[in-house]
Design a protein with these regions (language model features):
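Short, flexible segments with low predicted structural confidence
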Residues: 1, 15-16, 32-34
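Short, well-ordered beta-strand segments in beta-rich or mixed alpha/beta enzyme
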Residues: 1-8, 38-65
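Short, surface-exposed ligand-recognition loops at beta-strand->loop->(often short) alpha-helix junctions
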Residues: 8-17
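Short, low-order "capping/linker" segments at domain edges
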Residues: 88-95
Length: 95
C-alpha cells in the first residue's frame, strides 16, 4: 500500500510543518509493516510538502492510522492532493 501526494501550506510555515511531523515519521518507520515514510519540502514550490507512505499491507496501514501519534502543531493545510494506492506488483524502475 502506498499513500502519496502533496499538501500545500503557507510558505512561511512549511519548515515548521515538516518539523512538527518528525515524531510521526520516526514512529512510522518503526511501526510494524511500515516500509518507508517521508514528509519532505518540495525543492521547487515553496508551499508544497511531498507525502510518501509505504506499508506492506492494507492491515498495516490501518493499524498505523489507528495508533499514529498526532503532531502537536497547528500549521493549516491549505490544499491537499493525497491518494492511497493498492499495489499488486513491484519491480525495478528501468527494466
Amino acid at each position: 500500500m502506498i499513500v502519496a501526494g502533496r499538501v500545500y501550506v503557507d510558505p512561511r510555515d512549511r519548515e515548521r510543518f515538516v518539523e512538527e511531523h518528525r515524531g510521526t515519521i520516526e514512529a512510522a518507520r518503526n511501526a510494524p509493516g511500515c516500509l518507508d515514510m517521508a514528509i519532505s519540502p518540495d525543492p521547487v514550490d515553496p508551499a508544497r510538502v511531498n507525502i510518501f507512505e509505504h506499508f506492506e499491507t492494507a492491515e498495516a496501514l490501518e493499524y498505523w492510522r489507528a495508533t499514529a501519534p498526532v503532531p502537536e502543531g497547528a500549521v493549516a493545510i491549505e490544499k491537499d492532493q493525497v491518494l492511497k494506492h493498492e499495489i499488486s506488483a513491484s519491480g525495478p524502475p528501468f527494466d
